Amino acid sequence: ATHGTGNGTIENDNGINFAASNVGGNLNATATLGNITESGTEALTVTGTSTFTTSASDADITLATTTNAFTGAVSLNTTGSGGNAEVIDASALNLGASTVGGTLSARAVTGDISNSGNLAITGAATFRTDADGSNIALDSSGNVFSSAVTLQADGGGEAFGNITFVDSAAVDFDSSASANGDLYINASTDGAVGGNLSVTATTGNITQNVALAVTGTSTFITGAA
């Protein structure tokens, strides 16, 4: 724990297993050879930004306690196709610049999901909001999703508010996340958005294999020359 706005930095030659921790400033954690995990249901509370990095190929980051409280942006960095990352925030989740070699699972229990830095995700990515009518805004211009992306409203049983999504390649609306480029809006009705929908494919096409039901405005942008 730190007092006031003090920062916390930890680097371990092996893995890191967090007990319950409170950091008033920023947290920077690097595991050189192992995984980064949390002990049981003990939560991390970080007022500033949080950066978690595994240096070994295929090492994971698993921050899956539902009472984690990350007030600032959370950055996740792994290497190797088996280097997966999972993060849960008890309220809203803001993802900072992150590079994940495997899959990414990001969940906000009571708030929205957004990103304040570019996301480069090699494996499949799932973004889940549990609160009905919550928003997902993945709008950084340098986002690179190399595999399929699922936007999930509480396990597919609730409705979204607004969705903003930017990818460097093509985007294909689909009823599942089975192929590279698929964007699966998994709500109470698949493809349904209760607010506004904005999707940008900076270098590819935008296509669909599932009907979209958008209550608000819809904006589709392709940036390729």
Segments (PLM) and residue ranges:
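Extracellular lectin-like interaction modules
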Residues: 1-225
